[in-house]
Amino acid sequence: LAEERAKGYGYVLAVGSGTLNDIAKYTTFRQGTECGVYATAASMDGFTSGVTPLICGGNKVTVNAHTVRHVLADFSVLCAAPRIMTGAGAGDIFAKYCCLADWRLSHLLKGEAWNEEAASLMRAALAQCVENVGSIAACGREGVEALFAALLVSGYAMVISGNSRPASGAEHHMSHFLEVYFLRRGEHIPLHGVKVGLGTLVSLHMYKRLKDVPQDFAGKEIAVKLAEALPEPAWAAGVLSSLGCPTRFSQLGVPEDVVRDMLFNCWKIRDRYTVMTLYRENDLMRSAADELISLFY
């Protein structure tokens, strides 16, 4: 439908946030035209990325698109957006702690290519959000500016690295697993960043608990060292909660057995090494699952 309506036009402007932006990017990519976005919420990091998620046959897939030509925003509009949408944006950005750790883990353990320029851009944008976290929680101008800038930088970092590594790790795999669950049941799907925020809490705890795991395994020392640079899950939960985001999967209406299934199987979502893959390789989830369920369900 979008492609049909865009025929004959050389430019499409999406007015909105995630879904409309994705549709415009994909449609104009296929037609060889250009697009822009007038953002109405700082809710996700796909504004400037070169890929777009699509729902195909009841599954979530990521396909090539192109980045927008222009990004327009009125910060009075962004600040007035529903708090949960700003919370979703915060969930997507604070997830970058885990994304970068997962990427570095894969680089050091598996030799995956690492792009320092993309990682440095993401770290700097993340630091600005941490510095303005109080204003973000209050949906204040400075905080929303920092958050929106970080969301744009995240897209640029993906373009620079040539993939979504700077912006997507195990927490996104958890989100995508749950998205498929909601899709197949025909139920309303919670905002992407809301689910990613929950996945971030799980990933942070998975990293932090490694130092107390008695079992020795390849990569443990590296993972524990990476965990030292990560914030405490309680801090991230406080930020998300202040914006109205859930901090337990039960708040999404997901059954406990589905969350348990997610913990054991979401690594299959994508062939990408993360802390979740580390747990699978070393059979760590069997001893961690009950603990994670008690904390986050």
Give the positions of each predicted feature.
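Generic hydrophobic alpha-helical membrane-span motif
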Residues: 24, 45, 80, 177-178
